[in-house]
A protein has these predicted regions:
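A detector for short, charged/polar N-terminal pre-domain segments
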Residues: 1-8, 74-75
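Short basic helix-loop element that most often maps to the first helix and adjoining turn
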Residues: 11-30, 55
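Short, structured segments at the rim of ligand-binding sites
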Residues: 15-16, 35-43, 47-59, 63-509
């Protein structure tokens, strides 16, 4: 039990340090100790006194623990409050994790601007650090610098961190250019049913990659005599599948054509980044990508990921569900046009500014103002489609929006095996959602939300939807174990509080 306690304390200290934007060396200097001692503390391999915990908390401006048992993070939500004001959309979580994987292609220094400080990014940084990549937060913890070693140490990979993120699968594309064989832990992430790497392998086998899965590890081998002689046709127009194919093609010495490619926002951001690395990519924004690879990439690059359309949709949904007037700034409009068209059909009162460019110089942004509206259920069902259709990740938000509208709305979440089931958690808060089958939910509105205490759904977007409903419900709700939300959103509770919400973060004591 004592060892388990030290591990939990160590993780809390590590998270607080990363949130502050400090390295282990910086914390060690503030404490007057060594970096190796801080490393042992964070790994749970060092006995630590309450006095030292207090000193660390003071140095990091964070209460590491209160007296009692340290446990997962929870949210206490006082609902029924209107939001107001304006808020900027953060950079894309899905783009940032793809770009972090893409830095493995480059021998030079990479700086990524305004990187989302979320658990998914932290886990990837832990994995990168464990194999020898030097990363540090710069410019007051806003930007991220990545410098790779001459040789990666894959034997030292942090398997625990790797298994807590699905993004680790995107190491396959870059690593096949750096070594002839390697091992990679099984990917984890949020629980969205059975996932398979076969769509990835259909693309990556064309570059000579072969994988055997044994004992929780992918054992990868690369046959250098194999290369794609004809276009690669993806059997699944998935985002990470397309990204893996792009990462493999980037350092292939030749031209690679990828068909049935995703043209979603994070794929486009990755293409823009590859162009900054000197890789020419034709067809960006279409389903056919032509990649002119280069065998060696050794450049110092500075890149600004674009804003996150799914976070923008989250904030728009927060305004709708709480019947608030809210301005959401820096919205990547190209990736929300279908969603806004559906909301307009439902009766949403909103306006938008003229378009302007994101810091990457390519993505089109607008500022959106949403006002309280009397919504009607849409005539057609809500269902996702590959871009430019309604984004898969935005489907859950329509459950809360439909529950606020007059009438019945059919939501068909055909992509995932069980995400629709998690949406029925809204019934605990007064919703009227009927699960027709594992993929279809019938939502009846409007809803008089009521407060409740419940566990956080294990899938990211449904978890946020539950939080939004709690914000609309009169009374005090508790959402327990919100790690999955922290995987995809930076300081969401604090940012919603800045708009008028009342959300308290706490841990069991």
């Amino acid at each position: 039990m004592a060892d388990d306690y030290l591990v939990r304390i160590g993780k809390l200290i590590r998270d607080a340090r990363q949130h502050r934007g400090w390295t282990q060396s910086q914390l060690a200097e503030a404490l007057g100790t060594s970096q190796s001692a801080v490393n042992r503390i964070e790994r749970g391999n060092q006995n630590i006194s309450l006095e030292m915990i207090a000193r660390i908390g003071e140095a990091l401006d964070s209460e590491i623990v209160s007296l009692g048992y340290a446990g997962p993070m929870h949210l206490r939500v006082v609902g029924g409050r209107r939001l107001s004001g304006s808020i900027d959309v953060k950079t894309s979580k899905n783009a940032c994790v793809a770009l972090l994987c893409a830095t493995l292609l480059n021998k030079g220094r990479t700086v990524l601007r305004r990187v989302a400080r979320i658990e998914e990014v932290y886990r990837l940084l832990e994995v990168l650090g464990s194999i020898g990549v030097r990363t540090r937060w710069i410019n007051d913890g806003v930007d991220l610098e990545i410098v790779p070693p001459a040789q990666l140490d894959m034997e030292a990979i942090d398997a625990e961190a790797a298994r807590r993120t699905r993004s680790i699968i995107m190491f396959l594309g870059p690593l096949l250019h750096r070594m002839d064989q390697f091992k990679l832990p099984y990917a984890g992430g949020c629980d969205l049913g059975t996932r398979t790497i076969e769509p990835h392998m259909i693309a990556l086998r064309r570059f000579g990659l072969d994988i055997a899965a044994t004992e929780g590890l992918y054992h990868a081998r690369v046959d250098r005599s194999v290369s794609p002689a004809r276009p690669i046709v993806l059997t699944e127009r998935g985002d990470t599948v397309t990204e893996n194919a792009l990462l493999a093609a980037a350092r292939h010495d030749g031209v690679t054509v990828i068909r049935n490619a995703s043209s979603n926002y994070m794929v486009q951001d990755l293409c823009f980044f590859l162009e900054a690395l000197g890789v020419r990519v034709e067809g960006i924004g279409t389903t056919t990508l032509t990649v002119h690879g280069v065998p060696t990439i050794d450049v110092d690059v500075d890149y600004s990921p674009s804003e996150d359309p799914v976070e923008a949709m989250s904030l728009l949904a927060a305004a709708v569900v709480t019947e608030s007037e809210l301005t959401v700034r820096r919205v990547p409009i190209e990736f929300l046009e279908i969603e806004l068209a559906v909301l307009e059909e439902m009766g949403l009162d909103h306006d938008r500014t003229a378009e302007y460019f994101a810091d990457n110089g390519r993505t089109r942004l607008v500022d959106l103002t949403v006002r309280p509206s009397k919504l009607e259920a849409p005539i057609d069902k809500i269902h996702p489609m590959p871009f430019p259709g309604l984004n898969i990740d935005n489907v859950p938000f329509f459950a809360a929006i439909a529950a606020s509208a007059q009438g019945k709305t059919l939501i068909h979440d055909w992509v995932y095996d069980n995400r629709a089931i998690y949406l029925t958690d809204l019934n605990r808060l007064g919703g009227r959602l009927q699960l027709l089958d594992p993929h279809r939910v019938l939502v009846e509105g409007p809803t008089r939300w009521r407060a409740a205490e419940m566990m956080c759904p294990p899938a990211l977007r449904p978890a946020v939807v539950v939080l939004l409903a709690m914000m609309a419900a009169d009374g005090t709700s508790v959402l327990r174990n919100v790690y999955v939300i922290n995987r995809g959103y930076e300081d969401l509770a604090e940012r919603l509080n800045s708009l008028g919400a009342q959300i308290e973060i706490f841990r069991d004591i």
